[in-house]
Amino acid sequence: MIYAQILAGGKGTRMGNVPMPKQFLLLADKPILIHTIEKFTLESRFDAILVVCPADWVSHTEDIIKKYITDERVHVVVGGADRNETLMSGINYIQDHYGIQDDDVVVTHDAVRPFITQRIINDNIVAVLENKAVDTVVPAIDTIVRGANDQVTDIPVRSEMYQGQTPQSFHIKILIDSYNALSSEQKASLSDSCKICSLAGQKVSLVRGENYNFKITTPFDLRVASALVEKRS
């Protein structure tokens, strides 16, 4: 089976003084999260679409989905304390409600990347069915500088650098085995789901993203996103 998992567990602290997590803020006439869910409901190959959100916001999430979304494949799941616990909460839901077969895959995506295209979703599905793990990236435009203690320690070759986006897609059993193989210290250091597999020695394939598949994190991002929606309408 092919699952989608929309990670909506963030608190949105970098958005500033706002009354709710950023995924629930309005973008034009509806919440950011709804824009994202709609993109995934267009893909008929998904057997289920999980929206994983903070426990305190489950009722709100269910209410807005009921208002805007009619697709019965969409289910709300309680997330965890951080990104990767939220990811694994979705995996546990799949295990409990559907069982997990050897060829089951999951396409995971940030709730606050509402401009994902059907091409990116399709490329993730095709790639993850052929590979064990897939990351969506765009080539780095600016030079990447590594530093410590206010000093430059390395300047990697830019042509080898990419900026990570989502979706990040996985064979579910490989993801579970990779996560369980990590130490507590490794799990605590995770800032990216694909790192679960790379730390466990699994190869991660690349899918080309798009510059406008950006993450709405700050007030500036929200203004840019609002301008894009207005232009498209």
Swiss-Prot record:
Primary enzyme class: transferase
Catalytic activity, reaction form: D-ribitol 5-phosphate + CTP + H(+) = CDP-L-ribitol + diphosphate
UniProt: CTP binding residues: L7, A8, G9, G10, G80, A81, D82, R83, N84, E85, T86
Residues at the site labelled Positions ribitol 5-phosphate for the nucleophilic attack: R158, K215
Site (Transition state stabilizer): R14, K22
CDD domains: CDP-ME_synthetase
EC code: 2.7.7.40
Pfam families registered for this protein in UniProt: IspD
Recorded metabolic or biological pathway in which this protein acts: Cell wall biogenesis; poly(ribitol phosphate) teichoic acid biosynthesis
GO MF annotation terms: 2-C-methyl-D-erythritol 4-phosphate cytidylyltransferase activity; D-ribitol-5-phosphate cytidylyltransferase activity
GO terms of biological process kind: cell wall organization; isoprenoid biosynthetic process; poly(ribitol phosphate) teichoic acid biosynthetic process
Keywords assigned: Cell wall biogenesis/degradation, Nucleotidyltransferase, Teichoic acid biosynthesis, Transferase
Presence of keyword Glycoprotein: no
PANTHER family according to UniProt: 2-C-METHYL-D-ERYTHRITOL 4-PHOSPHATE CYTIDYLYLTRANSFERASE, CHLOROPLASTIC (PTHR32125), RIBITOL-5-PHOSPHATE CYTIDYLYLTRANSFERASE (PTHR32125:SF8)
Chain's role: Catalyzes the transfer of the cytidylyl group of CTP to D-ribitol 5-phosphate.
Similarity annotation: Belongs to the IspD/TarI cytidylyltransferase family. TarI subfamily.
Name of this protein: Ribitol-5-phosphate cytidylyltransferase
Species lineage: Bacteria, Bacillati, Bacillota, Bacilli, Lactobacillales
Designated gene of the protein: tarI
